[in-house]
Amino acid sequence: MGLLSSSDGQRPRLLGLLQRYSTVLCLLLYPIGLILFAGLAWKPLNERTYFSDNSLLPGMVERASRIAGNAESLLESLELEVAEHPGLPTAWLAGEFRRAGLEVYRHNFSLAYPFGTRQLYHGENLYAIMRAPRTSRTEAIVISVPFRNSASPHGSTLASIAAVLDLAKHFRRQLYWSKDIIFVITEHELVGLQAWLDAYHLVETSPGVILPGYLEARSGSIMAAVNLELQDKHIDQIDVKIFGLNGQLPNLDLVNTCKDLLLRERVPYVLEGRMDPEESRSFHGWKHAATNFVSQIAIQATGAPSAGHGLFHRFAIQALTLRGEPKVPGYRHVGLTPVGRVVEGLVRSVNNLLQRFHRSFFYYYLPSSDRYVSIAYYMTAFGFLTGGVLFKALALLLELMDQHPSVYLTLLWRALPFVLGLEALGAGLFSLVTHGVDIVKHLVPLYTQDALYVFTVAASSSLLLTPLFIRNAVHPLAQRLLMYLHFLLLVAPLSMLNISLGTIVAALGVPVVLTAGVNCPLPIRIMRRLLQFVTNPLLSSLLLIFCYAVVSETGSLKIENTEQLYRALNQALQGHRRLFLFALEDWYMYGAVTYPLFCLGFLPVWSHMWTL
């Protein structure tokens, strides 16, 4: 610890000031961080989007496709085919792609459901490759569509398939392609797409769960992908989906290219379901932008992809989804031709690239489609938000050195096994979850969703007893110091993996962490315990879902009668159960890290705080 003292044994003045005023720093830095995050949505504090890679040239790309007539005819034929054969019409699709002059292949895969009897499901994808006539075929672009018929709860995508078929015929007649174009029609939503990507790259993302099979043919390295989900031949607007697995984002240049083409084709659009705010520096404009900002934080924090494009990001493939919902009668609608031209423009722009996307941002927020917040801005706000914990940890270390100058390291080493024990408990919960679900279902006849919820709640609630085993067994200052470091070791890496989730954890956790273990009067200690209990990962996630349910039910956080309260509570409990099931399924099938973070990060850190 020579860095904390000078050669004559005196402590540097700066460290002395830090130790004396650490509490003041904590009181200042946290609200400054919150204010900075709120201010990032204000126009003067963010930047206008721009193209970093001029080779994309969306304004120079000629978009000549006119697919409306042929695509509508194909759509009618496809609807008749699906009415007779509800599954993926592989024979019909293969015939259409072959008539367009493409190589057509089928891809079989299987899913072994990871719970219960591990029931085996089978599926089939179909993909067609249009080989580039001008190069050695070492690079490719993917256009994917998930197959959904009219009975799907997510809406039919037959219009997307018809549009893609006609685009394939148009593309095949052109000679300027320098990259192969792969058209992929997938079955079983994200499972089919994940299986195809695994088979294409010769990997297994989820060994023993998704069995990807093999592909008869493939192309080169995939540069970019467009996932198309049109629910009708006439739509109101395009919803651009950008969030991927674990909060990953496509390169900002690809998003800017898509936005530019939508504007040029006069296609109304929204970004992740939110309209652009007014071009104004007024409070109303900031409020709209801040609402978009908070909405993006909420979507990204879940770690789940907002659409099928999100599975491409793991393989360094820049991708986004264009989703169109059926038009509302009486309002202006958009046909297939302008949407087809947007897709054509995107593919042609990527076709111009000489190397992978790398010049623009991969870490950003978009308060509107033409304004962005770069990592330099939001990480500064995050630093202020969590900086108080770091300074307080350093101040505690100095205090521990003053009180026990010869044995402070020994005290820290004695406290370390408790931290490792908490992590071991979290690892046990994570590794035994499938067995725990089977045990609960054996004892009580419950569905998998309910059995998982019962096991998770029971196992997590047992951590409330940890203070009984640790009280007075570890030096309180050493335990507080390690708790601060434990918290920082969670949120610091999380800020790079998923900044939105890290921000939510920091915003909820910093006040509770800083006040844990501090000597104070009994009434304040009781309030602190209540606050710690509310910030339990299980309870806090339930409260957030309840608030969302109330807003969805009433349009605000105000509940007017008991019926609204009952409906909101019922929706929150149902959503909370589904949250854990989906998080665990996403981990086993796609590698989403939300459930591992819950078991290995959030619960151990909260339990550590609870013992103080």
Show where each model-derived region lies:
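Alpha-helical metal-binding/catalytic segments enriched in His/Glu/Asp
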Residues: A128, I143-Q194, S460-T466, A492-P493, ...
